[in-house]
């Protein structure tokens, strides 16, 4: 219940703008300005209690408390490491980012790319920090985390060994913005060791809030040049690199003056007419050096003489050192990998860019209710969360000769690095996209059934199921309605996720789920209509007071269920019996009279029939995944969120819902629906309660 309340509160805060870059969420409720001012007033340097200078902040295994790698480590402030520490000198450069004893080169490559864009760098690394003015041993940074900007505060105690920084450091040893940025990122992920191993695109996204895709240039898609042009039009960040095969290859220069293992940026893509034919050209920037391409279409290449002088002047006008043109074919031949970080509309301040349309949806997989696994598990796959995508407008131009709607889908699993300390790691995740059949178009209140997925193939799917934080793919489909189904590879895996869809044109996205509905069968009974046989049974069971209490009801039902071989049950708990009495006790006596007991008896027989029919394997019990169908048979349609609550409340560790819990669930639902209907006679879908009423209903 606490989790539901937290989600509701968070949704309300997000609607008010909390989590935007301008109103970043304070991680662990630590406010930078408040903490710094407190330290300055006290004349003390900040010590972060939430990420202490202790072995627990380093790691849990290779960097754990008893590891040889962590012996002799001392935590020191920059003022103790060098005579004149600086936060940042003359802007950020790649020499500020040298890898240490941590396998987070993926993160450092993303930081290096971040330095190519001063505006975006300043969002992540506030540049007005220093070791001189108002220095209090405290620094702050901003990261994008699953749709929200989060401000993280750290103290400046850094792990050292033999007087040297253990992890990332600057080449000169006196600049500390990158080391403190790495520490803040380690904090939000639980510890330094949690950063070991990852994809550069993960860092790209956490520094920009964008959605990052990458291409192996040995196997490029046929429309890659057009993809690059469109990405540049939309203000995306594009980076490329040449793979290295050994440590000796790092920073090695090829005979045509390209540097291996080096982060380049792509800044232009143009088609020019040369000697009667069209040439595709790519403009590359080497941001940290004068080393430039000497192959065809370099600055001094005679090929430029075959181009219209005005076009040539336009393209070769030098913006800054380190920028050069090369043919697209040479680009594919010499470079290994291209990464595109598509930025969100709020990141781009320039109105000249053609901005992506962005939608984000949050969801979760919960064991026993919405963690159905992939298509290999047909009995549970349909239980996964489902999202409707309505593609309405085609792209303005067909980049590959095919009309359609271009969109990117990114499925991110949340907080998995943080859980490495607890022995957890990334789930293997992926998704499928299904075309909505004509008879269901326009409906969002129907969770697609098991039979639909047994008879319908996916129209598109993620390239693979993989244990990375994000699975991302680019698609182009005709206008229409589609359902996206995210899943873990295996069922029964708990996890939170967010889905982001970037589309060229406006599209509509929403959760596909059953609407809340209760068709409760009202059993009409008059005492005169009750047969003599049932009257004699009631008189025998009720005793002299002609009423049945919850305790008497428990004894009666235990005897009844003991005779049934098709339902495994130890009888009903006293809690279940009490709420059954509460449901029908119209006179407030706390007991059931003849008519009330007759209605309850009829209901229990109906519950038995449903339970037996849903139990297809004749085990005498019900699996939690069968509960959804059982609730529908009983007249209740509920969204995924409520199924998660029901399974958490009524299923055991093996995801079994016994007959007692099944009945208790149905009775509680019936009571709650009836209360709501009484308090909402106009069917507005909303009621108001004071505290005493809320508490009275909550203890049911």
Curated annotation (Swiss-Prot):
Q: Which GO terms describe its molecular function?
A: calcium ion binding; calcium-dependent cysteine-type endopeptidase activity; cytoskeletal protein binding; enzyme binding; peptidase activity; protein-containing complex binding
Q: Where is this region: Linker?
A: 515-529
Quote the annotated effect of residue 262 to A.
Loss of activity
Q: Where is the Calpain catalytic domain?
A: 45-344
The residues the record assigns to binding Ca(2+) 1 are: 658, 661
* Binding-site residues for Ca(2+) 4, renumbered to this chain: 292, 299, 319, 323
Query: Gene Ontology terms, cellular component aspect?
Result: calpain complex; cell projection; chromatin; cytoplasm; cytosol; dendrite; endoplasmic reticulum; external side of plasma membrane
Q: Where in the cell is it found?
A: Cytoplasm; Cell membrane
Positions of the EF-hand domain: 572-605, 602-637, 667-700
- Effect after changing residue 105 to S: Loss of activity
Residues holding Ca(2+) 7: 615, 617, 619, 621, 626
What role does this protein play? Answer: Calcium-regulated non-lysosomal thiol-protease which catalyze limited proteolysis of substrates involved in cytoskeletal remodeling and signal transduction. Proteolytically cleaves MYOC at 'Arg-226'. Proteolytically cleaves CPEB3 following neuronal stimulation which abolishes CPEB3 translational repressor activity, leading to translation of CPEB3 target mRNAs.
Per the record, the similarity remark reads: Belongs to the peptidase C2 family.
Q: What is this protein called?
A: Calpain-2 catalytic subunit
Instruction: Give the organism the record lists.
Output: Rattus norvegicus
Chain's gene name:
Capn2
């Amino acid at each position: 219940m606490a989790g539901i309340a937290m989600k509701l509160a968070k949704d309300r805060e997000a609607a008010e703008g909390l989590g935007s870059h301008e109103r970043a969420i304070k991680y662990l409720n630590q406010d930078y300005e408040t903490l710094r001012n407190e330290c300055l007033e006290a004349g003390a340097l900040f010590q972060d209690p939430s990420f202490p200078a202790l072995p627990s902040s380093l790691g849990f295994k290779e960097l754990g408390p008893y590891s040889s790698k962590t012996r002799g480590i001392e935590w020191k402030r920059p003022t103790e490491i060098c005579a004149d520490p600086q936060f940042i000198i003359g802007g950020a450069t790649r020499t500020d980012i040298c890898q240490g004893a941590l396998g987070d080169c993926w993160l450092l490559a993303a930081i290096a790319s971040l330095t190519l864009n001063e505006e975006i760098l300043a969002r992540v690394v506030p540049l007005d920090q220093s070791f001189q003015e108002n220095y209090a041993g405290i620094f702050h940074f901003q990261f994008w985390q699953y749709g929200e900007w989060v401000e993280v505060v750290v103290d400046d105690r850094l792990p050292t060994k033999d007087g040297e920084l253990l992890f990332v450091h600057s080449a000169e040893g006196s600049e500390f913005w990158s080391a403190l940025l790495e520490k803040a990122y380690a904090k939000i992920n639980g510890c330094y060791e949690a950063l070991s191993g990852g994809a550069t695109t993960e860092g790209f996204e956490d520094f920009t809030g964008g959605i990052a895709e990458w291409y192996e240039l040995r196997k490029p898609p046929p429309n890659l040049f057009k993809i690059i042009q469109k990405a540049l039009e939309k203000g995306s960040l594009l980076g490329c690199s040449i793979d290295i095969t050994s440590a000796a290859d790092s920073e090695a220069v090829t005979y045509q003056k390209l540097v291996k293992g080096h982060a380049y940026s792509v800044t232009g893509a143009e088609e020019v007419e040369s000697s009667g034919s069209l040439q595709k050209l790519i403009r590359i920037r080497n941001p940290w050096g004068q080393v430039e391409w000497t192959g065809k279409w370099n600055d001094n290449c005679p090929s430029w003489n075959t181009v219209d002088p005005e076009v040539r002047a336009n393209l070769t006008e030098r913006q800054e050192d380190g920028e050069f043109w090369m043919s697209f074919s040479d680009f594919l031949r010499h470079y290994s990998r291209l990464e595109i970080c598509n930025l969100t509309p709020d990141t781009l301040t320039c109105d000249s860019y053609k901005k992506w349309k962005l939608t984000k949806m949050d969801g979760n997989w919960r064991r026993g209710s919405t963690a159905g696994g992939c298509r290999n598990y047909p009995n549970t796959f349909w239980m996964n969360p489902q999202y409707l995508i309505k593609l309405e407008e085609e792209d303005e131009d067909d980049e590959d000769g095919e009309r359609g709607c271009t969109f990117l889908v990114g499925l991110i699993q949340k907080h998995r690095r943080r859980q490495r300390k607890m022995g957890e790691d990334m789930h293997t995740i992926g998704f499928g996209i299904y075309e909505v059949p004509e008879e269901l178009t326009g409906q969002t209140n129907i969770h697609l059934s098991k039979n639909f997925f047994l008879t319908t193939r996916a129209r598109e799917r993620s390239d693979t199921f993989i244990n990375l934080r994000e699975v991302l793919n680019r698609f182009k489909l005709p206008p229409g309605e589609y359902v996206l189904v995210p899943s873990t590879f295996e069922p029964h895996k708990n996890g939170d996720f967010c889905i982001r869809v970037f589309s060229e044109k406006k599209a509509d996205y929403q959760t596909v789920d059953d609407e809340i509905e209760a068709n409760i069968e009202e059993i009409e009974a008059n005492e005169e209509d009750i047969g003599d046989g049932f009257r004699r049974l009631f008189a025998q069971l009720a005793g002299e007071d002609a009423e049945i209490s919850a305790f008497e009801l428990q004894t009666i039902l235990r005897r009844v269920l003991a005779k049934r071989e098709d339902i495994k049950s130890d009888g009903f708990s006293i809690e279940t019996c009490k709420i059954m009495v509460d449901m029908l006790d119209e006179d407030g006596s706390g007991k059931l009279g003849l008519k009330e007991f007759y209605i309850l008896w009829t209901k229990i027989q109906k519950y038995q029939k449903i339970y037996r029919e849903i139990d297809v394997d004749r085990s005498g019990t019900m699996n939690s995944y069968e509960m959804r169908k059982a609730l529908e048979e009983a007249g209740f349609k509920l969204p995924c969120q409520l199924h998660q609550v029901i399974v958490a409340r009524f299923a055991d560790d093996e995801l079994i819902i016994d007959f007692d819990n099944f009945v208790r669930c149905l009775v509680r639902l019936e009571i709650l629906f009836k209360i709501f209907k009484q308090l909402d006679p106009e069917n507005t879908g909303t009621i108001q309660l004071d505290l005493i009423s809320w508490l009275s209903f909550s203890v049911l």
